[in-house]
UniProtKB/Swiss-Prot annotation:
Name under which the protein is recorded: Ankyrin repeat protein B18
Stretch forming the signal peptide: none
Database matches in Pfam families: Ank, Ank_3, PRANC
UniProt KW keywords: ANK repeat, Repeat
Residues in F-box domain copies: 541-574
Extent of the ANK repeats: 56-87, 135-164, 167-213, 217-249, 253-285, 327-356
SUPFAM superfamilies (alphabetical): Ankyrin repeat (SSF48403)
Amino acid sequence: MSRRLIYVLNINRESTHKIQENEIYTYFSHCNIDHTSTELDFVVKNYDLNRRQPVTGYTALHCYLYNNYFTNDVLKILLNHGVDVTMKTSSGRMPVYILLTRCCNISHDVVIDMIDKDKNHLSHRDYSNLLLEYIKSRYMLLKEEDIDENIVSTLLDKGIDPNFKQDGYTALHYYYLCLAHVYKPGECRKPITIKKAKRIISLFIQHGANLNALDNCGNTPFHLYLSIEMCNNIHMTKMLLTFNPNFKICNNHGLTPILCYITSDYIQHDILVMLIHHYETNVGEMPIDERRIIVFEFIKTYSTRPADSITYLMNRFKNIDIYTRYEGKTLLHVACEYNNTHVIDYLIRINGDINALTDNNKHATQLIIDNKENSPYTINCLLYILRYIVDKNVIRSLVDQLPSLPIFDIKSFEKFISYCILLDDTFYNRHVRNRNSKTYRYAFSKYMSFDKYDGIITKCHKETILLKLSTVLDTTLYAVLRCHNSKKLRRYLNELKKYNNDKSFKIYSNIMNERYLNVYYKDMYVSKVYDKLFPVFTDKNCLLTLLPSEIIYEILYMLTINDLYNISYPPTKV
């Protein structure tokens, strides 16, 4: 859509009515000026373009550089009619500074013209921050504006120091921030091609830029790039690694570039692998303390493929295992504390101990409860690990803390109580004894009324009575649901399926379904693996032929569903 032209000057007025200065300033500051207009031609030929405003110190050139309708064509006309490019505003701003930090769609030609009209040719100290401010403006203000490779090259060729610092940052610090924020969701920035980014960084290095310069917080440009949450592009990161940034530099918080990435709250598996591989290939073996921090901090962070990443890290760092402790906690403690269910599954699969205590004698369940930042997920995380907990004392401790647990989802809370009543057979009786205690009743007032809580417990208790009355072969449905041994539960599979469709169980139907599916899939994958390995078991040259099939089944049942699945369907290597 064409822009509406605004005319404020009547150049045909009587000679006794001269054009006022404020009209000229308004014309250059706010009007959409056509470079072919007679008004512009009249003004540049009949008006002193270098006359300054008394307060701001603006000339016609300064005014136009702040004009939202700026065009390169009008600027060229002003430059051709003798505007002084060395005059500063009252605040000390040079015209070329305003051009590079305020104007949009500037051409390389007008930058060259303006620089060439200054006899100092950017050698004066007033221009020392010009390159830094140009790139900073594209990072902070003109986010949709491109960083012109030719302009960067010209400024460097004219002698601008690429290592000049302002507020601790160099121009490269700001450029790396631009590269990072291009991929940050919601930024709406103009894309920067990898080839162009590589050429611009190469220009800096050719002119003596320090790629590992530190800001006031001790961060190199690469530190800043990796610390931007949800921004990193694997191909851009790979390109930046070709410049071999220093991986050993620690910032003021003791973080190397890799640790900056690990603590950025968003990790891409492929980038994590790339960074570690680059370190070990170009630097050498990573110090054990850094390896430990990487693994523990990774667990606290959101990642795109957590199961793949924790498997990679545990296999890569051989001296980090399920018993390794950092700040008094095992890996499994931290995974529970930060509700990282993928990592919890993996660590338990490789024999991590869910019942191990921290150095200050806290159980994993207590760590979940104590982490108030994750309070919306507390109940769900506790529900998740209850399937692994058989210690009645731990369950009882959880029950005692029910009044203080944050309730964000009433259905999850109801399911949690049903689990507690199922696993702790003293829960209901203790609740009944305390029912009339004002202190006990008041403890529940923070998240829900006591009457509602009491109603949930009563409903769960009634269903547990029904579970105890429901027979399953030689035992009760109550005992079956309390059992965690899938091999023992196998003989009750058909009965579980029948009860799974029983509409009389409204609260415990979910737990029945979980038990049924767990046993069903375990049995299915054991059979698949047995059939797949049958040629091995029957090979006369294999010692396994000496084992009865019952023993082989016993061994297979010791594996997790995940292990059995991977044997049945080995992952394809890309």
